């Protein structure tokens, strides 16, 4: 669904005034201004006012707002479940209750000016296709537009998004157009929605947004050459007969030569399908590889718990405990062993958090080879 003129429906709680538009001023009323009762496009309050109005309408229908993700609404009944996801004025409705979905669409039509776009094929730049294997998400058109804009549509493809063991630094000749670099990295960052294979490269390149150098630009071009090789690559979601949650966690150690911080990474699978992933530099310096891996495990557990809570809230049964895989034996021992010692006592908070989830039976750990 698409809501027409969505922001104009929002009710303003603040006092906001505007000048009268040209040609609207009546004789003798020059100098008067209008007080807004509804939000307008361009007001900083408009998105919040619109979301509040839309939330009230859904709650009136009987939908509940998810506590784990406020952009997700759900309703459970004897006929099944209805799920609604909203991003500003773009809406996706799905579920196992066809009659309920039809009733919800009719209800929204009475509240707002809506347009039913039919079966989901395109949403926020993400292309959705269906086959016997499952649902496939990609951003092929987005990639091709990006390559054309960057002048790389005819570029020679390469096999990796970043040169192996590449060490970027802040030193070097600055880019002639840093704004162009920032725009490119911003667009690549949005592409990671369906391309986890470039998540690490984009994470590294985004650390040099303030003063990008020519070396940084060349590294960004490497990502474009990699995308040229497979612009339609994406993620397939299929039915594999189970709903187990698995998470793979990893980290390097002191990988950044400038501040010696480590980079964490994880990917979360539900029912054999990849649903969440991230690559990010850690906030503190780790004193050992085990500590770096353990901090990555703590971040992974946070994401696993969030996924579990969201699925449980909307009525999707998942198998517990979730499995957390790591390739560092020392980090796994820290997670399962309640004993503190000199090398781990300063990461006490992370220790308590991960161990608590293990003791509660929500998480089990396992070793996987590098």
Residue ranges and their predicted role:
Residues 1-3, 244-257:
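Two-metal-ion RNase H-like nuclease active-site motif
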Residues 122, 244, 262, 274, ...:
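RNase H-like nuclease module associated with reverse transcription
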Residues 2, 18, 42, 54, ...:
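Mobile genetic element proteins and their domesticated derivatives, centered on retroelements
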Residues 226-251, 316-318:
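Structured nucleic-acid-interacting core domains from mobile-element enzymes and related host factors
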Residues 1-113:
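Metal/cofactor- and membrane transport-associated sequence elements
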Residues 40, 88, 116-234, 369:
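C-terminal reverse transcriptase regions that engage the nucleic-acid substrate
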Residues 56-60, 99-110, 174, 190, ...:
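Alpha-helical coiled-coil heptad-repeat oligomerization segments
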Residues 65-68, 93-138, 143, 318-321:
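Polymerase palm active-site segment centered on the conserved acidic dipeptide of motif C
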């Amino acid at each position: 669904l698409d809501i027409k003129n969505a922001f104009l429906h929002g009710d303003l709680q603040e006092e906001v005034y505007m000048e009268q538009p040209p040609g609207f001023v009546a004789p003798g009323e020059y100098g008067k201004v209008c007080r807004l009762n509804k939000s307008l496009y361009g007001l900083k309050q408009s998105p919040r006012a619109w979301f509040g109005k839309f939330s009230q309408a859904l709650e009136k229908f009987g939908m509940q707002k998810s506590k784990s993700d406020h952009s997700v609404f759900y309703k459970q009944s004897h006929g099944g479940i209805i799920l609604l996801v909203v991003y500003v004025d773009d809406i996706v409705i799905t579920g196992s209750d066809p009659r309920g979905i039809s009733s919800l669409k009719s209800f929204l039509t009475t509240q707002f000016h809506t347009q039913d776009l039919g079966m989901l094929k395109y949403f926020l730049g993400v292309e959705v296709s269906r086959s016997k294997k499952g649902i496939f998400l990609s951003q092929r058109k987005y990639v091709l537009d990006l390559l054309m804009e960057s002048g790389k549509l005819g570029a020679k493809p390469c096999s990796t998004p970043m040169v192996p063991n590449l060490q970027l630094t802040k030193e070097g000749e600055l880019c002639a157009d840093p704004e162009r670099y920032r725009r490119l990295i911003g667009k690549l960052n949005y592409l990671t929605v369906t391309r986890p294979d470039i998540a690490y490269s984009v994470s590294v390149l985004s650390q040099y947004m303030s003063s990008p150098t020519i070396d940084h630009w060349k590294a960004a071009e490497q990502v474009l050459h990699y995308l040229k090789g497979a612009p339609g690559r994406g993620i397939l979601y299929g039915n594999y007969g189970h709903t187990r949650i698995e998470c793979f966690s990893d980290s390097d150690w002191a990988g950044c030569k400038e501040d010696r911080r480590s980079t964490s990474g994880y990917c979360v699978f539900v029912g054999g399908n990849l649903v969440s992933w991230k690559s990010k530099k850690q906030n503190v310096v780790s004193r050992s590889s085990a500590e770096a891996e353990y901090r990555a495990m703590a971040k992974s557990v946070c994401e696993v718990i969030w996924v579990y809570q969201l699925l449980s809230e909307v009525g999707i049964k998942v198998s517990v405990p979730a499995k957390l895989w790591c390739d560092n034996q020392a980090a796994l021992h820290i997670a399962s062993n309640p004993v503190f010692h000199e090398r781990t006592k300063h990461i006490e908070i992370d220790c308590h958090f991960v161990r608590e989830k293990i003791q509660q039976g929500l998480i089990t750990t396992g070793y996987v080879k590098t």
